[in-house]
Amino acid sequence: MATKLQDGNTPCLAATPSEPRPTVLVFDSGVGGLSVYDEIRHLLPDLHYIYAFDNVAFPYGEKSEAFIVERVVAIVTAVQKRYPLALAVVACNTASTVSLPALREKFDFPVVGVVPAIKPAARLTANGIVGLLATRGTVKRSYTHELIARFANECQIEMLGSAEMVELAEAKLHGEDVSLDALKRILRPWLRMKEPPDTVVLGCTHFPLLQEELLQVLPEGTRLVDSGAAIARRTAWLLEHEAPDAKSADANIAFCMAMTPEAEQLLPVLQRYGFETLEKLAVLG
């Protein structure tokens, strides 16, 4: 009988034998990275996917850079010990802006990060006003401001940092309704503008999960832009040209850092995304 929930680094009994496929890790502090994973899976359905989320240290947006770097390196190391990786995707804007150099120095497989889609948004805007919706950490970091200066210096950039929206996205995947009133309150600075942004960058991987609700609250015709499709294309290129030959015939698997009741409640969601099992990952440090 298949074991659907496992606590600890024990073999996954629910794995279904198949042809070996390149193993790709998608990692986030929470479940927002599933939006990126979905784009990658749509383009590359025949891979062995691992999804890992750090429900112990979630959310990363309020953590120090040193903590994030140490934590992300430790988690990727723990996954790599279980499954040799062909490629890893850090599907978290906050973690990507600070941890990529350390990851690329430590590991010999490609590591793909997620950055706010400032460049395409600057090309799409008609009124020259672009909104960046992200965590407070992403909004404050110099990397984000460098992206704006490089790719959108002729645009008016309106930034909103929100940790509450991350929580709303997590709650939605747990089956809870999203409060449109809460979104209106968060977006109030834009909604009060005489000419609000006509293009909004979803600068946190959690936020595409709220796309339907955001479109109900933002002015009609507002474009929402995220990095998911671009990350999928980059992943495909790297797997073809630079990835090591790291394959597995196991079924797709998800890892949490603590097997809490809240994590267990996510199993049906993870199964809808194609992950057969959820295990606790032992992380050193």
UniProtKB/Swiss-Prot annotation:
Top-rank taxon: Bacteria
Active-site residues per Swiss-Prot or TrEMBL entry: C92, C204
PROSITE patterns: ASP_GLU_RACEMASE_1 (PS00923), ASP_GLU_RACEMASE_2 (PS00924)
Recorded catalytic activity of this chain's protein: L-glutamate = D-glutamate
GO biological process, one term: regulation of cell shape
Cleaved signal peptide residues: none
Coiled coil: none
E.C. no: 5.1.1.3
InterPro entries referenced in this protein's UniProt entry, alphabetically: Asp/Glu/hydantoin_racemase, Asp/Glu_race, Asp/Glu_racemase_AS_1, Asp/Glu_racemase_AS_2, Glu_race
Pathway where it operates: Cell wall biogenesis; peptidoglycan biosynthesis
Binding sites annotated in the UniProt record for substrate: D28, S29, Y60, G61, N93, T94, T205, H206
Top-rank EC class of the record's enzyme: isomerase
Pfam families linked: Asp_Glu_race
Keywords: Cell shape, Cell wall biogenesis/degradation, Isomerase, Peptidoglycan synthesis
GO molecular function annotations of the record: glutamate racemase activity
UniProt family annotation: Belongs to the aspartate/glutamate racemases family.
Function, in words: Provides the (R)-glutamate required for cell wall biosynthesis.
UniProt protein name: Glutamate racemase
Organism: Escherichia coli O7:K1 (strain IAI39 / ExPEC)
Lineage of source species: Bacteria, Pseudomonadati, Pseudomonadota, Gammaproteobacteria, Enterobacterales
Name of the gene: murI
